[in-house]
From Swiss-Prot:
Protein name in UniProt: Phosphate import ATP-binding protein PstB
Assigned GO CC terms: plasma membrane
Places the protein is found: Cell inner membrane
Binding site for ATP: G46, P47, S48, G49, C50, G51, K52, S53
Top-level division of the source organism's lineage: Bacteria
Function comment: Part of the ABC transporter complex PstSACB involved in phosphate import. Responsible for energy coupling to the transport system.
Entry-linked InterPro entries: AAA+_ATPase, ABC_transporter-like_ATP-bd, ABC_transporter-like_CS, P-loop_NTPase, PstB-like
Transmembrane segments: none
Sequence ranges assigned to domain ABC transporter in this UniProt record: 14-255
Protein family membership: Belongs to the ABC transporter superfamily. Phosphate importer (TC 3.A.1.7) family.
Keywords assigned by UniProt, alphabetized: ATP-binding, Cell inner membrane, Cell membrane, Membrane, Nucleotide-binding, Phosphate transport, Translocase, Transport
KW ATP-binding (keyword) present: yes
Membrane protein topology class: Peripheral membrane protein
Length: 260
């Protein structure tokens, strides 16, 4: 049972200003302007190839790993442009974490999956690591299922458990924002329901931006939805408003299934 959505805080944590992205000569994102509120869930929807996943990756500079990328415009996180020359990218990716479409646990124990990030960032004390592992697994609603087998290989978990483990691994390094790229697309309905409930619970402490092809999912969990088409945001508004009273003809056609 997914609990009722609470209103987000009226405080901007991320803002993009005329953000464009080029793959060599191809313009994949075209002057994106959007404000993300703290402790909110923002859903990004649109047909395949519309730019929503590309946009998501600009928010913690994951696109830097792709050759031939050029960025124009700004991404402001907590008042600073993350594309400025002196911005600490490692710290950025700690504060803005990422959960991918396919669960990708490391080939190591459940415990080591969670403790890996904190160790990299300097936490060595075993008692502190134990605490981080337990709290991260509790926040991801996985602790009760794995507390007696923390030394078991993470790949022994089910797909849904692996995805919650990946969320726990992200939480372990204390992010402020969690980016999710279709985190339930490879999961069965029961596992999907657990992840959705988890996402809503996480909103109390984190800001979440999620790419989803599932419009029903966007309706169930998000506060605001942005509809992407051809590298642009065609429309963004509170989720209920966008789905039940869209202002843009293309939005209405997409959510009614006329294309996509």
């Amino acid at each position: 049972m997914v609990k009722e959505k609470e209103k987000p805080k009226n405080e901007i944590i991320i803002e993009t200003e005329n953000l464009s992205l080029f793959y060599t000569d191809f313009k994949a994102l075209n002057e994106i302007n959007i404000k993300i509120l703290k402790n909110s869930i923002t859903a990004l929807i649109g047909p395949s190839g519309c730019g929503k996943s590309t946009f998501l990756r600009t928010l913690n500079r994951m696109n830097d790993l792709v050759e031939g990328i050029k960025i124009e415009g700004n991404v402001i996180y907590e008042g600073k442009n993350i594309y400025s020359n002196n911005f600490d990218i490692l710290e950025l990716r700690r504060k803005i974490g990422m959960v991918f479409q396919t669960p990708n646990p490391f080939l190591m124990s459940i415990y080591d999956n969670i403790s890996y990030g904190p160790k990299i960032h300097g936490t060595k004390d075993k008692k502190k690591l134990d605490e981080i592992v337990e709290q991260s697994l509790k926040k991801s609603a996985l602790w009760d299922e794995v507390k007696d087998k923390l030394n078991t290989n993470a790949l022994s978990l089910s797909g849904g458990q692996q995805q919650r483990l990946c969320i726990a691994r992200t939480l372990a390094i204390e992010p402020n924002v969690i980016l999710m790229d279709e985190p339930t697309s490879a999961l069965d309905p029961i596992s999907t329901g657990k992840i959705e409930e988890l996402i809503i619970n996480l909103k109390e402490s984190y800001t979440i931006i999620i790419v989803t092809h599932n419009m029903q999912q966007a309706g169930r969990i998000s506060d605001k939805t942005a509809f992407f088409l051809n590298g642009c945001i065609e429309e963004e508004s509170p989720t209920d408003e966008l789905f039940f009273n869209p202002k843009n003809t293309k939005t209405e056609e997409y959510i009614s299934g006329k294309f996509g």
